[in-house]
């Protein structure tokens, strides 16, 4: 994982919109239609107080001044990582993680989205307080798990200085007025929030309805977090959604099955790498055993796969 992530970071566009990497070679993502690499000014808050991501980040985080000589911008996030990293794909197929997803969201669980957050020391951008969900807040069937959850695998671990903070219990309180919470606190330091602190290799879980965010990484420690998100099938089937991670669409059964093939490819990629491990049995695609083999054709098939994310 460390080698793969380092290789992806090295081949990222040198700046927003660039087609070359820092070494002048062809950048990853240059031929993708889906959003892939995101850049921001060092220690800035690119989302807070804007209409981006459906305006779900209503308040702005404090933006420390970067050190003299800092670059004008830095890459802090990339989406669709399973097409760029075989190690990330194999992580996605981890039988224990998928078993947890099934236990939480049911055996017919679906994908949501994958992302890798890169918080370089002294450079990493903040992520303003928000709740991930945007679709089902007014549903009479809303409960504490309606908008799914994210696994957050930590490559180097995370600290209070560079990690995600979360407001415990907020996932069960519906849509909250985050701007009012910040105003009541008198700053972006919400007194109710606690940090997610992990060692290298730990995997945290975060409910997508929880109020959470992270401060600019003014620390000396790097954080790399691999997010793997999952939904209940009932929360996405025939639902009109999108607009944050993917274009608005109605998620019919065909789209869900098409997107879920990434789980099957990941399971097979992991089976090839770890033949003595018992692979996860993914029920929704069990009707076509052997259909999704990880090979060169599969690699071509998942190009731009995140165009079909299932964002709610």
What feature does the model see in each segment?
Residues 1-129, 135:
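Non-heme Fe(II)-dependent double-stranded beta-helix
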Residues 58-62, 131-134, 179-192, 222, ...:
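Short, surface-exposed loop/helix-turn segments at secondary-structure junctions
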Residues 116-123, 133-134, 156-160, 170-173:
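Short acidic/polar capping segments at secondary-structure boundaries
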